[in-house]
Amino acid sequence: MLIQILFLIILTLNCSYSTSYSTSNGIRLMTFNIWNSGANVENGQQKIAKHILMVNPDVVALQEVYANVTRNLTLMLGHPWVAVERNHEYPDTAILTRHVLIPNTNLSTSGAVGVKIMLRTGFMIHFWSLHLDYTSYGPYAANNKLVDKLDQIMAGENVGRGPQIYEILNLPMMKKWMEKVEDVPIFIAGDFNGPSHLDWTEQTKKIHGDWVIRWPATKELEEREFSDTFREIYPNVVSDPGITWSTVNKFNPEWNYTIPEPQDRIDFLFYKGPVVPYQILTYSGCEKPQRIPFHSKNDYPSDHFAVFADYTFI
């Protein structure tokens, strides 16, 4: 394990990525889809740990987490990193933090895990990592010329991603968290496997198959008064699209990489409560990832851009 940690430190020295932020009354959060737990690149799990160390977040929402991977990552990250994962044979979602997990507060749903965390500064947060259903991907339907009714697109949203958001919001314990949100903020982070209604607007419909769509997962969070951190800081969807899908998946392999893959913002950090965001970035390391099928030696181990944001408690 010591050799692995030294390996990570050496790799980290090669990048001058700036990660400064206030630690006294602030928090840095990250969402990171780790693409089959790093299986698609050489030394994938070591690279996952490396990039977490480079970003230096307080809490990380992970997706595509295989069994035993959080154990491996916490060992590589070292003390004081700890983890909680969804209670399932295939965890899929997990939360890493270098702060204190409050015992007996973790929650699991079909696509998410949540927990209460106490920061070493004394602040408390409620934090969710989610990974919504990947099937019936909305942008594929929206860009299909045979699709001419919104109901056809929404049919895929109403059986997977939409209900999964409702499941989280309607948990009895989540409702109790919501009652205390003026004192303890709630963060919902992860891979939504779908775009935002704030991005598919009249301004952008020409690049979205000529559709304006109120995607239900993000719309429901907005109606529950959660804020989309990226769109709050960057409200101009044309100049700041914030694409997170994909770092490497640019063309569909089934047609010899000649048909473009729709690129979209599908990884989010939502918040509600007594914090103010002041910085958010998409992240793929310092070396440009090579697209599929030339990706196996990439330094950055994911097909999604990670997203991290800094908040100040108020």
Curated annotation (Swiss-Prot):
GO MF entry, a single one: catalytic activity
Domain of life: Eukaryota
InterPro entries membership: Endo/exonu/phosph_ase_sf, Endo/exonuclease/phosphatase
Top-level taxonomy: Eukaryota, Metazoa, Ecdysozoa, Nematoda, Chromadorea
GO CC annotations on file: extracellular region
Compartments where found: Secreted
Organism this protein belongs to: Caenorhabditis elegans
Keyword entries, A-Z: Glycoprotein, Secreted, Signal
The name this protein goes by in its record: Uncharacterized protein F14F9.5
Sugar-modified residues: 68, 72, 106, 256
Signal peptide annotation: 1-18
